[in-house]
Amino acid sequence: LPEPSTLPDAAPPAEIRIDAPLQRFAAALAVLGWAALIAQAFISVNRHIALGNGAAYGVMMYTGYFTILTNAFCAMVATAIALGPQASANWRWWRAPDKITAAAVSILLVGVVYHFLLRAIHHPTGLEYACNIALHYLVPPLFVLLWWRAVPRGALLWRDAAVAFAFPAAYAVYVFARGAMAGVYPYPFFDVLKIGYGAALLNAAGLSVAFVLVGFAFVALKRGAASGR
């Protein structure tokens, strides 16, 4: 997938330029992402029904994972790109350069954190194994490739790194608030009941630093490419 031509750095575009290869690639990625998300939702909800927790509890647990929310974010972006120039204004909002970048930063770190921190304690089988591969190992690199191909040179400002951080920051607030009310935490490094607030907040701070650094790196890649800085 070749990268689009250089655009002026001084006036970042609100809309990306979509050609047929990009549209087809985005469509394939959207199908992969939505299929994995739907299959994983079916597995997760039915597991909790079988345990006697009910479907609503299953949905709550399913939507508590950053992996799920980030893959849904990426699937929305990919769908918006796949719809092409005729997409509505609402869909075009999802494919603005800052939104694509925010999704790319988060999905990259989803893959990295899972591989290094969670893989050893997670052992899915059957269909769930296939979903796990898609959500943690296929979508992350493919979406970063989509980001590289879709976001033009000079399309980002430094403040877009803050946009990229807003999503995981909001998730952290959600996780701790939900945990305080429901007593459940999706990840061991956030589990206040087991490691305490001090360790959980320290882990959140460490991940925040990672998100900020990666966000600035993504912006720098596109800004630097435009001007040679």
Regions found by a protein language model. Give the residues of each.
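Alpha-helical transmembrane segments in multipass membrane proteins, preferentially the mid-helix core
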Residues: P140-L156
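N-terminal membrane topogenic signal
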Residues: P13-L29
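Interfacial segments of alpha-helical transmembrane regions
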Residues: A89-S106, L157-F165
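Alpha-helical transmembrane segments of multi-pass membrane proteins
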Residues: V31-H48
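Non-cytosolic membrane-interface motifs at loop->transmembrane helix junctions
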Residues: G54-M61, R95-A96, H122-L135, W158-A161, ...
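Membrane-interface loop-to-helix entry segments
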Residues: F66-T67, E128-P141, L201-A205
